[in-house]
Amino acid sequence: MNIQQALNHITKNIHLTQAQMEDVMRSIMQGEATEAQIGALMMGLRMKGESIDEITAAARVMRELAIKIDVSDIQYLVDIVGTGGDGQNLFNVSTASSFVIAAAGATIAKHGNRGVSSKSGSSDLLEQAGINLDLDMQQTERCIREMGVGFLFAPNHHKAMKYAVGPRRELGIRSIFNLLGPLTNPAGVKRFVIGVFSDELCRPIAEVMKQLGAEHVMVVHSKDGLDEISLASQTYIAELKNGEVTEWVLNPEDVNIPSQTLSGLIVEDSNASLKLIKDALGRKKSDIGEKAANMIALNAGAGIYVSGLATSYKQGVALAHDIIYGGQALEKMSILSEFTKALKEYANN
């Protein structure tokens, strides 16, 4: 099916089959569709509502065409990632959580990009922390294997997505492409914590991940609108485990974390985000640092749980709390910074 035929279906409110969506996605990623057609597809799918089959097929094609790193043999391999688009400008919780998860003994292959709606995307923050993202595939694999944490800068792995950059920027709306980033980790990861911008997406995205072969996934959205597990409200969760999707609601008190407002956790830029994260992960914390540490523990605990290192989410949060207060996560961040700098210096000599 070509993109014009697909648009005709979509305007009639007809969902595309997986085979049809795969055809359309390939035409986009091979440069055969015009920017007007891509924009129309984005808007049409958004207005109709993207189906599980459409999202699955688009993600499968993106995975197929990605420049991959194969570290799928590593035990406890996990990604923690969000769609963005919540507009809250919170400090970068998922990136901070990555260092906690890695310090706990799991391996992080974090797929990320620059800020979508926040002022500090994962790549913005990491560069601010002195972590070199300008690494080739072999160097990135070394980070993952030797340091237990590596960052996969999305544009380096999904070069064919360049054809959608213009329409996405010009339209400025949430679209299927916001959903695809978290679903298309190029490192063979099968265990995920995925934050989404609407609770209505939790179960569908869990079902998509099931079709894509994931093993254990928590898809989360908080009642106060975050694509994270929130410190300030209930969080809706769809969990894929043992081939089944279950839905549940989490209150922070369920895992011995007191509910607190998000005041003090909003940041202006990546520099402010990094400062808050270092406060939260350090041995001595300010009052706001303590609050940020609790927020990180809630999310890192999910990553530890889905990785297989903890048998329950509650146990994962307790382990994350111990790691944060022991200072190992901040040490992991510092070591990765030095390692990536050394890799680049070695390559340049």
Swiss-Prot record:
Gene3D superfamilies from the UniProt entry: Nucleoside phosphorylase/phosphoribosyltransferase catalytic domain (3.40.1030.10), Transferase, Pyrimidine Nucleoside Phosphorylase, Chain C (1.20.970.10)
Record has Disulfide bond as a keyword: no
Catalytic activity: N-(5-phospho-beta-D-ribosyl)anthranilate + diphosphate = 5-phospho-alpha-D-ribose 1-diphosphate + anthranilate
Pfam annotation, one family: Glycos_transf_3
Cofactor details (free text): Binds 2 magnesium ions per monomer.
Record carries keyword Transferase: yes
Cofactor(s) this protein cannot do without: Mg(2+)
Binding site for 5-phospho-alpha-D-ribose 1-diphosphate: 82, 85-86, 92-95, 110-118, 122
Binding sites annotated in the UniProt record for anthranilate 1: G82, N113
Assembly mode: Homodimer.
NCBIfam families per UniProt: trpD
Record's function text: Catalyzes the transfer of the phosphoribosyl group of 5-phosphorylribose-1-pyrophosphate (PRPP) to anthranilate to yield N-(5'-phosphoribosyl)-anthranilate (PRA).
Family that this chain belongs to: Belongs to the anthranilate phosphoribosyltransferase family.
This protein's name: Anthranilate phosphoribosyltransferase
